[in-house]
């Protein structure tokens, strides 16, 4: 093993050469966290692995930022005053041939905003990502509600020698702004000036993964590592089949993402680094025998499963033995590895793990999503009927990841503004609202009833009331002498949402109506925001509620956390291994006559109650 000082110096140099470092060169960056994690994978079999001579590169998240303009505000915008941000925006506007930018920025219908997002490892040009928009301090803007972000450029910003430097354009951002107060169900002034554009960013670059080779490497050594990797992994494109590893220099190998691991890049890198560089048939037999013993030992099962997965189909028979173990951990790690080999035997165990053990749920859903076999589809379908909100929604998202055109999860676009899905479910009715990847509402359970309300609001212009015959009447208030448009529908969630859209409402208006209906006691279905599987959970044994003693600490899942469900704007670019714990929000029922006078909706409720 190399001395710590020389290894660290080598890593710094290689990161600088390859350009794979965080904006502020923090040693606690996401990439350095993963380097430390990967370095802990000791090799007990004596065979040299790819990971023994390489370090992964490109596993960090790139923060990109910019300044842009939100327009379409209903008198809630305003000038931000003189600042470097304002000067930058004026320069951007002039590059788009906008006339009189100074005058435009003073309009109450527009607002300067700071835009930011995160480019994940392995991102390709054209991929979408979520974007956050924030009104800067001292701005006169009071709300971004109903605003639309005009196309803005985003760059990586770095501080070098006490000076701010920006790179080339790394992303573009554009789309309707969803203010954070929509998800919080409040008129909070701060949340009104902060929001997000779901899937509104578009990457303008491709970030390849890579392996840096330790020590004084040669072209021949790099080629040998590439050949070992390509003997296990290859991809198919319009030019035919090719290996995923491409030696670029004597100390650097570029690594393409294998399609099976597109939602779990960190696992992919760990499997690649678990490939044997050179191994005779006799050595392979001895190593697999050793790995079988380790697989059946719960404390060593996770790493053994990775090495067996790296061997490939030739090791599947050993992983199948793991499915018969009495240990839930051994069964899970064996099934997870088998899933990435697309073995149907994995599906049943993974479905059980997702439904019953929260610490394994995140990984099990991602593994099922990667499988092509119909057994995985059936397992995910069954999970749509379990009580857990995060399991049901996680199964839905996994099914969409497998095949977005599947009639079960295809849904429809309402008003061109958000995706709408109605899923048959035998569990209690639930409505899920997304705040990541795309505007999306999913009804779990058909014909969900709405108790005709005295009144509730969908935005500030649409009111919903019950009729004498038990239906719903929706009215959109307009200015002037023209008659207010109205819609009448059955007292169910599905037709109510469609009526809101017909009256010109969008995602924000629908989400507000659902919140008010739930809080007012007009909905039996629970309304949940961002119910996704969570990291940082621990497995306590067969009884997850059983407290463990200091001598028997809970077991944290050893596998790298996949990205299929991560809300990156909530994590501030941290790796999912280190991100803080947060739970999905469930909208609770509160009395409809709540006399809150601090918000617009509270004042309206009190007015109608008189």
Model-identified regions with their sequence ranges:
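Bacterial N-terminal signal peptides that target proteins for export
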Residues: 1-10
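C-terminal motif of bacterial Sec signal peptides marking the signal peptidase cleavage site
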Residues: 17-19
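Beta-strand/loop-dominated core regions that host nucleotide or nucleotide-derived cofactor-binding catalytic loops
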Residues: 21-60, 65, 71-300, 311, ...
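Predominant activation on well-ordered alpha-helical scaffold segments within soluble catalytic domains
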Residues: 90, 226, 230, 266-269, ...
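Amphipathic alpha-helical scaffolding segments comprising HEAT/armadillo-like alpha-solenoid repeats
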Residues: 281-293, 313-324, 343-354, 373-385, ...
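Structural detector for internal amphipathic alpha-helices that build alpha-solenoid repeat scaffolds
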Residues: 301-311, 321-322, 331-343, 351-352, ...
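Core subunits and conserved enzymes of cellular information-processing
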Residues: 325-328, 355-356, 385-395, 508-512
């Amino acid at each position: 093993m190399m001395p710590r000082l020389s290894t660290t110096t080598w890593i710094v140099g290689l990161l600088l050469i390859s350009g794979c470092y965080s904006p502020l060169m923090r040693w606690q960056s996401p990439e350095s966290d993963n380097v430390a994690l990967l370095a802990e994978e000791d090799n007990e079999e004596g065979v040299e692995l790819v990971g023994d001579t390489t370090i992964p590169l490109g596993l960090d998240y790139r923060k990109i930022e910019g300044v842009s303009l939100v327009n379409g505000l209903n008198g809630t915008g305003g000038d931000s005053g003189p600042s470097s941000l304002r000067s930058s925006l004026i320069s951007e506007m002039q590059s788009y041939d906008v006339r009189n930018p100074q005058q435009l920025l003073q309009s109450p219908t527009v607002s300067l905003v700071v835009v930011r997002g995160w480019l994940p490892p392995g991102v390709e040009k054209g991929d979408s990502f979520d974007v956050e928009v924030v009104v800067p301090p001292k701005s006169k803007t009071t709300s971004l509600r109903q605003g639309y972000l005009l196309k803005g450029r985003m760059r990586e910003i770095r501080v070098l020698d006490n000076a701010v430097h920006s790179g080339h354009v790394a992303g573009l951002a554009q789309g309707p702004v969803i203010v954070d107060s929509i998800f919080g169900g409040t008129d909070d002034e701060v949340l009104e000036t902060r929001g997000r554009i779901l899937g509104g960013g578009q990457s303008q670059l491709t970030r390849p993964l890579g392996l840096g080779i330790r020590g004084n490497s040669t072209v021949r050594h790099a080629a040998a590592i590439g050949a070992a990797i390509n003997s296990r992994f290859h991809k198919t494109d319009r030019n035919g089949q090719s290996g995923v590893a491409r030696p670029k220099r004597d100390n650097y190998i570029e690594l393409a993402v294998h399609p099976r691991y597109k939602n779990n890049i960190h696992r992919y890198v760990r499997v690649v680094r678990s490939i044997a560089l050179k191994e005779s048939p006799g050595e392979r037999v001895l190593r697999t025998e050793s790995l079988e013993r380790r697989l059946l030992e719960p404390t060593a099962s996770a790493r053994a499963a990775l090495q067996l997965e790296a061997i490939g189909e030739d090791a599947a028979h050993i992983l199948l033995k793991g499915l018969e173990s009495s240990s839930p951990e051994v069964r899970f790690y064996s099934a997870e590895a088998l899933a990435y080999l697309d073995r149907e035997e994995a599906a049943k165990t993974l479905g059980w793990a997702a439904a019953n053990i929260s610490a394994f749920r995140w990984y099990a859903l991602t593994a099922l999503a990667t499988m092509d076999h119909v057994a995985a589809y059936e397992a995910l379908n069954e999970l749509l009927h379990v009580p857990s909100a995060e399991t049901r929604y996680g199964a839905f998202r996994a099914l969409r990841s497998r095949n977005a055109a599947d009639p079960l999860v295809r849904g429809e676009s309402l008003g061109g503004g958000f995706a709408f899905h109605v899923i048959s479910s035998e569990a209690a009715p639930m409505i899920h609202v997304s705040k990541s990847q795309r505007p999306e509402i999913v009804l779990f359970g058909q014909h969900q009833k709405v108790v005709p309300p005295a009144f509730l609001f969908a935005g500030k212009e649409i009111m919903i009331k019950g009729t004498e015959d038990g239906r719903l009447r929706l009215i959109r208030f307009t200015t002037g002498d023209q008659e207010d448009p109205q819609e009448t529908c059955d007292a169910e969630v599905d037709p109510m949402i469609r009526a809101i859209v017909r009256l010109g409402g969008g995602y924000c208006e629908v989400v507000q109506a659902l919140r008010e209906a739930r809080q007012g006691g007009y909905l039996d279905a629970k309304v949940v925001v961002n119910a996704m599987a969570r990291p940082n959970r621990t497995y306590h044994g067969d009884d997850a509620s059983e407290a463990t003693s200091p001598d028997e600490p809970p077991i944290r899942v050893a596998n790298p956390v996949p990205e299929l469900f991560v809300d990156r704007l909530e994590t501030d670019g941290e790796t999912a291994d280190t991100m803080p714990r947060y739970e999905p929000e469930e909208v609770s029922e509160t009395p409809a006559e709540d006399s809150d006078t601090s918000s617009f909706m509270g004042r309206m409720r009190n007015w109608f109650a008189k």
